Amino acid sequence: YMKMKYFIIFLSFVISVPVVAQEKYSTKNGTIVFEASVPSFEEVKAKNENVSAILNVETGDFASLVLINGFRFKVALMEEHFNENYMESSKFPKAIVKGKLKDFSATKLSNGTSNYTLEGTITIHGVTKPFETSVSISKKGDSLSVESQFVLNPTDFNIEIPKIVSNK
């Protein structure tokens, strides 16, 4: 009952300024929500609130790491299938995004929201692919909020979805 022809991923991080190095913002409790739901079928949605991310505001370099088995589903059986059958999280425990924000400038980060393009790579299920997505960064006081939404195709990452499941 898990139709996963596409994952829709919502990335959301609130990154606070560390005391020592002002040029790097980081968090260990960012959030990723993914959805692979289809109308009229059971909701396939999960959330992970222990995502690590770092942004170097001098270079625009960005990196994020998520432990796959940290995704929480409403239905325990879905979580089990996700980890064991699809993502094989014991073999491929993490997903990583690394990249650079194009035309990023720390001086543009006044209170408010700025939009950038993140170019780099994404590694899921042991497969690394070129990756590009729109990112919005909002500054409020000493914190940055980094948000993005994108669609991934599981077959691009050698994630096999049985036909009986993907045809539902």
Segments from the language model and where they lie:
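Low-complexity, acidic/polar, glycine-enriched regions of mature
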Residues: 21-168
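Bacterial Sec-dependent N-terminal signal peptides
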Residues: 1-25
